Amino acid sequence: QLQVLVLDEADRMLDLGFSKELDEVFSALPRKRQTLLFSATFSEVIRQMAGNLLRDPLSVEVTPRNAAAKSVKQWLVTVDKKRKSELLLHLLQTQNWGQGQLLVFVKTRKGVDQLEQDLQRAGVSVDAIHGDKPQPTRLRALERFKAGEVQILVATDVAARGLDIHDLPLVVNFDLPIVAEDYVHRIGRTGRAGATGLALSLVCADEVNQLAAIEALIRQTLTRHDEAGFEPDHRVPLTDASGQVP
């Protein structure tokens, strides 16, 4: 009886390992149907899925494939891994961010909890969401952030997927994502609906391969900045949009 199939966040489903389950769903579908597939990025895997699932599809692109929104200013600060929390607190005190809210992405649940504790000890208004927190707790944290009751929300990629926060001025990548496409998803939380936004990444030497992959994906070299007093002991090699690491 199914007439319309809608696949939203298709790339994330594949990233999370649901390829087999999707194939099982597809095999049970009637041939005569309408299929709508939405994805913030368009990898080769997504292209293959679309080719197998869709017949004579109409493609609608709101931005170039895998491109970051032009309304978002992107830059990075190089820093040693062990000083990232200290650097973030320093930037909160010295940058002209005012009382604007920040969405901070961390790659692990343990890392989310640790950064939340570091910020709380420094007197910063912060909440956190990740997959180990009960759904009611995550929803409450999100509602508090949307209401402006906390300045910073720390989150993992999965927990923050699909967040729609009005007028969010700044996204911080405390850790670079393992999957380059997630960078586009992350910074897409800001600079929405014609507004401008900022996206800052704190990058250590261990993340140079991830940085190169991100720059190759978005086809641009991110502007670098060394913060005085936080110059890394372990240099982050120069990268560019070619994706090559020296």
What positions do the PLM features span?
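Conserved helicase RecA-like core
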Residues: Q1-T239
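Intrinsically disordered, Lys/Arg-rich low-complexity segments
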Residues: T239, Q244-P246
